[in-house]
């Protein structure tokens, strides 16, 4: 950043330094050095006694900026900078232009001879008279902010992009073109008036500057709104449009309208614009108006079979284009939309009208467009949302938002001032064309809303209106603690004794107690109603409340006692509820423990069932295996029977019951076995070898035949097939046993050879000598205790026998 600094000295002895610092890149001048001189000039009108080190506070600085219409830019370090034009205006106002003219090569500014107020802006020579007039009007609008006693802290916190207090001059031109002679006055024109509406400046009527007609549009006003008596009504529900063609057409129109720099404008439109610029006789507003109509025609050409519906919601909250444009303070487009049929009575999903959107943001406060906005959106004043909240409710709620206190006070004062001033303004009937024409000989239109919407109706129907919670606007303001708005509402006649559904009243929060005690009944500053329509001193209800409070001021002792009783009651209720909840908690804990026990039992039963299921599955598997084994054994038995010569037909009648037939029983015939057993015991002492040596088989068989008849022997013998099976089985078993014996003998021989080999290796002798030495070795080992064996003697023994 390249800075240029020039120091000059003021005062009769040149003892007051004044430094001008300019940023050569942007051309802006540092504001800090102007502030001490401006403060001294504002307080005394003389700068010769300025203390250059005495800087005003933030609040005083903001008042100076508002009073002199200074727009500032803030850099990254927080320093405030002003533009070249404003620097020249301030230097000329302070008669310091000549000191710095040569240093910065300033051009001599042209002074407006008709301007008497030093706070009004003065422009350089290169400004035209038209531009000078516009800036003067803008400066007046900005200067009015200081007169309203705005909250400077809240004003500094406003988050609007218009915070620099720059006024769009095209809006002012649009006002003068569409509504002749409607130059807007100060936002607080009515604040400076007495209760009867008279101006305090020696009877001068400030309404002369705002005497332009109010142009009415009735395309959206039904008979309910135009009929008498006037009453508060619900906003129309947000429309539901399912036609995608209409949505696409509206979207295309809004894109071309709001973002013209990214749209390709038709050649004809550009040519028309160039022709108008070349003529030099049309204003910025006229160019915008033609652009609006041209864009409208362009969209109609693009969608010839689809009607342009300006009331389609553009977001999920049900906001129409009119809602959005009022919230961003685009007055020019609001006027065009109303002229072309946009419905002002539609609410969003919460029933909030477009005027509510205007007061819920600070944009209309920053740009000073709220008063002009009321000329087009006045039907919204009698609307309430889904929670029965009027426009006054929403203004008060806005005052509780961070940085919006000053804006809310501005909206309230402008609204009440517009209500009073509109009674003296003519009314014209507007159409959806470019011009509006009066509908009677006096150029006025009899509109029931404008006829009946006076301050008396506002006080009677809206000031003390309650929302769905029973809150009046005064109740909300008292709870928020906004003293300036509370005092204003009380001056208008708001009732501080109306309780909401919770039983709370504004007076419970101190609303009106201190103010009314210090207010005289004849104080002219407390009167807020015009003389022609309503006298605030004759308001019976407000007068009764005021006199009641003055005669019987509230006792703080009783209030403290009531609060103490309320706290005690709340504490007792809390203790009772705590006991109840503790009992419920204990009961729940008990039930929880029971449920836990039941759950544990259920889990145990489930584990047992799972175990039984596993055992059952195991037994099922074992049973299946047994059945399979039995089947295999039966198959094997059948194969073995075939090998033994047992035919299935022959063995079908045999009883194979294990109780009568033992598969392991020796192959014997019972009577033969008994005969041989008896013979062995009697004759051979049980030695069968002696029997076989003494007698042959034929002799034994002959003896049996002699003892028993052949029929009995035949009956006692098993079936032939069984005998054959036994014989074959015996032979097979004998063969099997012989094979087993041979196998064992072979294994034994191999084992003996291994042991013989081991001994030969241990004794270091030949294998063929091991057998001869085994007896002596065994005797030597077994005759001694293993612990007492003399290994040397054993070695001698082995050597002796080895030789």
UniProtKB/Swiss-Prot annotation:
The modification Phosphoserine is found at residues 149, 160, 176, 547. GO terms for biological process: cellular response to heat; G1/S transition of mitotic cell cycle; positive regulation of reciprocal meiotic recombination; positive regulation of transcription by RNA polymerase II; regulation of DNA-templated transcription. ANK repeats lie at residues 318-346, 347-383, 384-469, 470-498, 499-514. Keywords: Activator, ANK repeat, Cytoplasm, DNA-binding, Nucleus, Phosphoprotein, Repeat, Transcription, Transcription regulation. PROSITE patterns: ANK_REP_REGION, ANK_REPEAT. The modification Phosphothreonine is found at residues 179, 182. One of its GO terms (cellular component) is nucleus. Residues 270-288 have a biased composition (Low complexity). InterPro entries: Ankyrin_rpt, Ankyrin_rpt-contain_sf, SWI6-like, Swi6_N. Component of the transcription complex MCB-binding factor (MBF) composed of SWI6 and MBP1. Component of the transcription complex SCB-binding factor (SBF) composed of SWI6 and SWI4. Interacts with MSA1 and STB1. This is Regulatory protein SWI6. The gene is SWI6.
